[in-house]
Amino acid sequence: MTNIRKTHPLMKIINNAFIDLPAPSNISSWWNFGSLLGICLILQILTGLFLAMHYTSDTTTAFSSVTHICRDVNYGWIIRYMHANGASMFFICLFLHVGRGLYYGSYAFLETWNVGVILLFATMATAFMGYVLPWGQMSFWGATVITNLLSAIPYIGTDLVEWIWGGFSVDKATLTRFFAFHFILPFIIAALAMVHLLFLHETGSNNPTGISSDADKIPFHPYYTIKDILGALLLILALMLLVLFAPDLLGDPDNYTPANPLNTPPHIKPEWYFLFAYAILRSIPNKLGGVLALALSILILVLVPLLHTSKQRSMMFRPISQCMFWILVADLLTLTWIGGQPVEHPYIIIGQLASIMYFLLILVLMPMASTIENNLLKW
């Protein structure tokens, strides 16, 4: 008799995706982050669900409901900090996952890559709205500043902002709708992740060499299941170290002050994982220009497959491109640092140079490096 996992309509899908899936024999630990992102998402949905049971999305009670969760709910503090720091782990995995895609040329799978970019946008939107919910000072002012950017859109800008706010300022209506969206979006992300996986399994995984691995495939289970379990254990270890020893390390102290529309914090800044984009936004003196640069800093990922000029797929055997890639990483770290600094000399000019460098690297220098490598190899 044929095994049930190969015949049952539902089990067959799971079997073909996680058990009998033919996988390249040489994929490194950089290929672990997809499964880690899945674990992060499940963890965020579960902790978020338990937080939502005690949270109230009203301006008068939101802050105190979060305090109540931390003080009075059984293990509420650990659920809250796992959710807050889980978001940080989520973005660390996201950035490494995207970086892996850039380095090894995984963006050649166009559908998978583009769904991934949509996933990145959806996750950023979810994280932004989640940051508003505790209704601390940084929640309120972050929401005010970021939503206000839409007013830079010509003609419809002001109406659009007031429509999003549900009034003439960030208030009760804004908080309620942000909570509703923050609750629904992770499920949309989960659905998109399935589409992401569907497209990936149409082609099969890429591998570090960027060469077809059809001649040498191994079953996903047990080889990569055990590898993913190791990755998951390390992820949970890192998360719990953060939660239990330094839960507020990545947060902003201003968010422990209840939201006050009459008192602006001296430095308004988003969570650390948005700082690179925030630095690009701030480095352009024009409001509309800044908003466009902010959007393009992520949207530029869609252009990456079109800018691929190399005859090779992966950067594994391309030292000049490798050099450009690591300069890009250093540039993004610089932007992250600048995003958290006040707007004063010398930070302004460093931010502007790093922003120019970011776009220059992706649009000009990396394609140029690839062309030079092709010529050096007489291709």
Curated annotation (Swiss-Prot):
Binding site for heme b b562: H83, H182
Domain of life: Eukaryota
Cofactor: heme b
Entry binding sites for heme b b566: H97, H196
Topology within the bilayer: Multi-pass membrane protein
Subcellular location(s) of the protein: Mitochondrion inner membrane
Alphabetical list of InterPro entries matching this protein: Cyt_b/b6_C, Cyt_b/b6_C_sf, Cyt_b/b6_N, Cytb/b6-like_sf, Cytochrome_b, Cytochrome_b_C_euk/bac, Cytochrome_b_N_euk/bac, Di-haem_cyt_TM
Key words of the record: Electron transport, Heme, Iron, Membrane, Metal-binding, Mitochondrion, Mitochondrion inner membrane, Respiratory chain, Transmembrane, Transmembrane helix, Transport, Ubiquinone
BP term (GO), one: mitochondrial electron transport, ubiquinol to cytochrome c
SUPFAM superfamilies in alphabetical order: a domain/subunit of cytochrome bc1 complex (Ubiquinol-cytochrome c reductase) (SSF81648), Transmembrane di-heme cytochromes (SSF81342)
Family: Belongs to the cytochrome b family.
Assembly notes: The cytochrome bc1 complex contains 11 subunits: 3 respiratory subunits (MT-CYB, CYC1 and UQCRFS1), 2 core proteins (UQCRC1 and UQCRC2) and 6 low-molecular weight proteins (UQCRH/QCR6, UQCRB/QCR7, UQCRQ/QCR8, UQCR10/QCR9, UQCR11/QCR10 and a cleavage product of UQCRFS1). This cytochrome bc1 complex then forms a dimer.
Protein name: Cytochrome b
